[in-house]
Amino acid sequence: MQTVIHRKTIQNSVTLKGIGVHSGKVVTLRLHPAEANTGLIFYLYKGIQKIRIPVSLDHVVDTSNATTIGDGSSNRVQTIEHLLAAVHTLGITDCIFEIDSVEVPIMDGSSLPFWEGIRSAGIRVLEETIEPITITNPIWVVDGDKYLVMLPSDELKVTYSIDFNHPLLRGQSYTTTLDESILGTDILPARTFGFLKDVEALQARGLAMGGSLDNAVVLTDDGYLNDHLRYDNECVRHKILDLVGDLAVMGRPFRGHLIASKAGHALDISLAKCIMSQVTGNELTQYKSKRIPLFSKKEAAK
């Protein structure tokens, strides 16, 4: 017999502030309770404008560096996956996010501050229920030597492998079930990671201005710049965090065995679209990157 899952929102509003990883500016993010069936909705404040951008697959507009949603024009909110990983872990289905920048703050580079913030606000269980996504046949997406598979399972679990051209990141893998407790202790604290040469190249273009050892694991050609890691395999754990956050865009709890190799945001969202197409029987609108710059000169100056 399938366990009934109730929709959830937060009990009280909570404000989180942090640095935008690209702008280097302080970003304010406010989370508010919402009625059942509201879903997850961002309100982007730009001057006197208040722009509504729902969290849904049809609103994903770019996956090149992070997962970005938009309203169909130039308005968008990027780097939503760390927040959504925490939201999904705690079972939040209905919440309003007010934000004063085009990017969710990077915080410490993980989902932990969002998880702690939501827990501090309290969680309210709603009367309404929500049906989890389950599949009866394998679903997969492939891009060259990269792939992402979802197999039928009564629980959520993952087997993830990464293989970068780096002595510390060759063949790093991790397998685990993903219940709330395991996600909270073993996955959500894992920080984003990057290579020093890539960070320097981005900063030369006026991007990644908020990136630092305070919010990322940074790798040199032969080691880590950071004094210590939270886990020996923190990098692959963070990729699992990203995957959970990206699939949370589906807007429903999900179950299955996820098997990933060298995947990323684009494959994550492609799999989510395949899953929802099978579950609903409807073909979802294909997202199209408008190739909007991460920041315009005007936004970067704010």
UniProtKB/Swiss-Prot annotation:
BP GO annotations: lipid A biosynthetic process
Cofactor dependence: Zn(2+)
Keyword Hydrolase: yes
InterPro entries: Ribosomal_Su5_D2-typ_SF (IPR020568), UDP-acyl_GlcNac_deAcase (IPR004463), UDP-acyl_GlcNac_deAcase_C (IPR011334), UDP-acyl_N-AcGlcN_deAcase_N (IPR015870)
Residues the record lists as binding Zn(2+): H82, H238, D242
Catalytic activity: a UDP-3-O-[(3R)-3-hydroxyacyl]-N-acetyl-alpha-D-glucosamine + H2O = a UDP-3-O-[(3R)-3-hydroxyacyl]-alpha-D-glucosamine + acetate
Keyword annotations from UniProtKB, A to Z: Hydrolase, Lipid A biosynthesis, Lipid biosynthesis, Lipid metabolism, Metal-binding, Zinc
Listed pathway(s): Glycolipid biosynthesis; lipid IV(A) biosynthesis; lipid IV(A) from (3R)-3-hydroxytetradecanoyl-[acyl-carrier-protein] and UDP-N-acetyl-alpha-D-glucosamine: step 2/6
Pfam families: LpxC
HAMAP family: LpxC
Role noted for this protein: Catalyzes the hydrolysis of UDP-3-O-myristoyl-N-acetylglucosamine to form UDP-3-O-myristoylglucosamine and acetate, the committed step in lipid A biosynthesis.
Family: Belongs to the LpxC family.
Protein name: UDP-3-O-acyl-N-acetylglucosamine deacetylase
Organism ancestry: Bacteria, Pseudomonadati, Spirochaetota, Spirochaetia, Leptospirales
